[in-house]
Amino acid sequence: MKLIKNGKILKNGILKDTEILIDGKRIKQISSKINASSSNIEVIDAKGNLIAPGFVDVHVHLREPGGEHKETIESGTKAAARGGFTTVCPMPNTRPVPDTVEHVRELRQRISETAQVRVLPYAAITKRQAGTELVDFEKLALEGVFAFTDDGVGVQTASMMYAAMKQAVKVKKPIVAHCEDNSLIYGGAMHKGKRSEELGIPGIPNIAESVQIARDVLLAEATGCHYHVCHVSTKESVRVIRDAKKAGIHVTAEVTPHHLLLTENDVPGDDSNYKMNPPLRSNEDREALLEGLLDGTIDCIATDHAPHAKEEKAQPMTKAPFGIVGSETAFPLLYTHFVRRGNWSLQQLVDYFTIKPATIFNLNYGKLHKDSYADLTIIDLNTEKEIKSEDFLSKADNTPFIGEKVYGNPTLTMLKGEVVFEEEK
């Protein structure tokens, strides 16, 4: 057994002194004081820090199979554990794509061999993510895939998305969508606005995202499908999702830390560490995202952790791949910028990473109580640390946040009662 002493948990927004007794994989007792005298008990000193439920990230890219030069299941899940995550859901833009039962089984085998945290894989919506032929939803659902998505690309035709939603309803699984109309991208590498004009870099307009969301929420209404929108980035998208929810359509949405923290004006020049998809938008868009998150239009935060090799990101923005890493920096950045400055409560932030994503996808994770799995993370809210690439457990360090000084760093993460990350002393 394990006993975590000298910790604090959030109860109705208030930090309470807490000890947690763990028996095997599950929590046996949570109390302000636990008297356990057995010599078999391993004591973990939380040192007065927060004990939070293990975080749930419904949007990561682990790159394996096919992209192991960028990231592997092992390195990506080590990075997740360092960031406090105990459950991650990897996107299907791998090679091969998890679009058949055989490919999903091969992926699960890899996961079972090297994953450091719980991994719930998505299956693709269309074969090879080519947008022309649906996967076998029934067989893949029976195989236990988390949900269906073609993330990395948008489903370009309404007829294909309509057919996919009807199949998803039959198997009672969500459709998760990267919303991007290819006919409106115009070869863009950042947001289309004043800053892109100043830099002479082609831009992607807001409507490339929002028109596809508008299309899809109507299809979701017609089919009754649970439709989840990935990485919302524009004010128009927030408005469409808000209106859809008011109309009773089953739509949920996520937002990334970088879209909450940065705008097009933060792009210093031709620096591919500021290139992600969707791109960093205007400050007006960022404010709409913050408002949407706080009023419940946007349901949760997801990292869209997207690692790339150094040589790939060393290219100009017009040639480099989209994406930044985020698993190891998400919570500290948001805690530092929003909670410490009094804009959010600590309870709100923890919920965005735990119970909110778990609830919208009907996952029995993201909470701490008697008999639940001992999935948790201990977080130091008071010590300032600098984000350094040499500290990353990910294979990649493509992020604009290197050098930022942050609070709220996880010091230990536990999955089913086993320590999967512990800060070096």
Swiss-Prot record:
Pathway: Pyrimidine metabolism; UMP biosynthesis via de novo pathway; (S)-dihydroorotate from bicarbonate: step 3/3
Cofactor: Zn(2+)
Binding residue positions for Zn(2+) 1: 59, 61, 151, 304
Active site: 304
Cofactor binding, per record: Binds 2 Zn(2+) ions per subunit.
CDD domains given in the database record: DHOase_IIa (cd01317)
Binding site for substrate: 61-63, 93, 277, 308, 322-323
Keywords on record: Hydrolase, Metal-binding, Pyrimidine biosynthesis, Zinc
GO annotation, cellular component aspect: cytoplasm
Chemical reaction(s) catalysed: (S)-dihydroorotate + H2O = N-carbamoyl-L-aspartate + H(+)
Coiled-coil boundaries: none
One GO biological process term: purine nucleobase catabolic process
Binding-site list for Zn(2+) 2: 151, 178, 231
Highest taxon of the lineage: Bacteria
Gene3D superfamilies, alphabetized: Metal-dependent hydrolases, Urease, subunit C, domain 1
EC identifiers of the protein: 3.5.2.3
Molecular-function GO term, any one: allantoinase activity
Record's function text: Catalyzes the reversible cyclization of carbamoyl aspartate to dihydroorotate.
Record-linked NCBIfam families: PRK09357.1-2, pyrC_multi
Family, similarity comment: Belongs to the metallo-dependent hydrolases superfamily. DHOase family. Class I DHOase subfamily.
Name of this chain's protein: Dihydroorotase
GN (gene name): pyrC
